[in-house]
């Protein structure tokens, strides 16, 4: 752990994260213990939940397009590590299976892996040789040429040529906003929407999501062919109230850890007051309203599902036994992997180990009393 003392409060908290989300935000790089690559079991569980919808949609789309020779897809917010290529494999598997059943030749497939420029694309690219070898071994001549490329940039804006994509997918990315909402300097003691947040904070977060999500839809409408499909999965909330427990509880616990550190003189409370996460968990009706208002897509499916907060507590892990300490560590490392870049940029790297040790203890205690789940929204849309 980096050292710091009670008498030497780090001089960070410049608030520049407000304007530099695109430059700062990334999942923790590499393959070490605290990396996203090692702490993304929750995200893998979400991908597995969506797999039947993904495969059914890809099969129906490829058939509807009359088995085209070329098929182009994009995965938005791909991040880094082993999860990155799971969706690509599932799409290939669906197409290969359909071609086998119908006697058609497999297409040439182009896959664009998109994330912000600060993403660890190098880790992703290092996975490609083994991935291509696995495809050849498992599918043989049943799989056509597959070209996988990185496409750095924000999906809140254009990324690809007009009408160049057949299918777009995104998992656990759209809840990240393009920037922290403006005008929420009065959100004292919170790092997100919370029970004590003033009303204008809720309004600002919703307005930023409306703006960002509308821009995402407009951008993809230009890039997806008519009749093409898009599937998005992201964190949401179960009720309209923006302070619902499935929306705010975990981040309120993280904020309490920061406030404890401020009370001990380890960080400045003013720095907490100027830090807010660029994140929004929408209510399902908010999503539906934005899609209908933007007007470029028809909603095929709009549904919700839940997964346990500890990604290791899933249907595939039959031997899972709850352990307060281990569960707290699992959840803490997951949240560290997704938020460390923003927290370290604002508060300094020296506090990160201590912060997430405290968070592991708090979240473990909470989960020993109450099983908490992540509430998710799945939307499948067709380009008009």
Task: Identify the role of each PLM range.
Residues 1-163, 175-197, 232, 237-238, ...:
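N-terminal charged/capping segments associated with class I S-adenosyl-L-methionine
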Residues 46, 208-212, 279-283:
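Soluble or luminal CAZymes and related metallo-dependent hydrolases
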Residues 111, 166-172, 288:
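Conserved, well-structured core segments
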Residues 163, 212-219, 223, 290:
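Short, conserved SAM-binding segment of the class I
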Residues 170-215, 224, 238-275:
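Mobile active-site "lid"/loop adjacent to the S-adenosyl-L-methionine
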Residues 212, 382-384:
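Intrinsically disordered, low-complexity regulatory regions of nuclear DNA-binding proteins
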Residues 226-351:
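Substrate-binding/catalytic lobe of Class I Rossmann-like enzymes that use SAM or dcSAM, i.e.
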């Amino acid at each position: 752990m980096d050292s710091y003392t009670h008498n030497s409060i780090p001089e960070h908290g410049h608030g520049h994260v407000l304007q530099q989300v695109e430059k700062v935000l990334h999942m923790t790089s590499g393959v070490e213990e605290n990396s996203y690559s090692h702490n993304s079991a929750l995200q893998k569980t979400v991908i597995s939940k969506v797999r039947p919808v993904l495969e059914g949609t890809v099969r129906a789309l490829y058939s509807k397009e009359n088995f085209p020779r070329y098929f182009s897809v994009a995965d938005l917010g791909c991040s880094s590590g082993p999860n990155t290529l799971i969706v690509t494999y599932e799409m290939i598997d669906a197409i290969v299976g359909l071609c086998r059943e119908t006697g058609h030749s497999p297409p040439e497939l182009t896959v664009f892996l998109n994330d912000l420029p600060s993403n660890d694309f190098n880790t992703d690219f290092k996975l490609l040789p083994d991935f291509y070898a696995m495809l050849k071994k498992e599918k043989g001549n049943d799989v056509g040429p597959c070209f996988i490329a990185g496409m750095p940039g924000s999906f809140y804006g254009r990324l690809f040529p007009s009408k160049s994509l057949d299918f777009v997918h995104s998992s656990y990315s759209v809840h990240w906003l393009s920037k922290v909402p403006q005008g929420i300097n009065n959100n004292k003691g919170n790092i997100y929407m919370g029970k004590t947040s003033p009303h204008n904070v809720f309004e600002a977060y919703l307005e930023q999501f409306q703006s960002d999500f509308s821009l995402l839809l407009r951008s993809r409408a230009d890039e997806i062919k008519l009749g093409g499909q898009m599937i998005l999965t992201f964190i949401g909330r179960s009720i309209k109230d923006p302070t619902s427990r499935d929306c705010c509880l975990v981040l309120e616990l993280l904020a309490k850890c920061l406030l404890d550190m401020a009370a001990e003189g380890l960080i400045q409370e003013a720095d907490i007051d100027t830090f807010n996460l660029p994140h929004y968990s929408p209510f399902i009706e908010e999503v539906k309203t934005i899609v209908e208002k933007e007007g470029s897509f028809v909603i095929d499916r709009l549904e919700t599902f839940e997964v346990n907060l500890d990604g290791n507590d899933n249907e595939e892990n039959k031997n899972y036994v709850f352990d307060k300490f281990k569960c707290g560590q699992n959840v803490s490392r997951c949240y560290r992997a997704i938020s460390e870049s923003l927290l370290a940029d604002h508060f300094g790297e020296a506090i990160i180990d201590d912060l997430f040790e405290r968070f592991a203890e708090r979240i473990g205690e909470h989960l020993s009393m109450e099983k908490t789940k992540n509430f998710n929204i799945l939307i499948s849309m067709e380009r008009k």
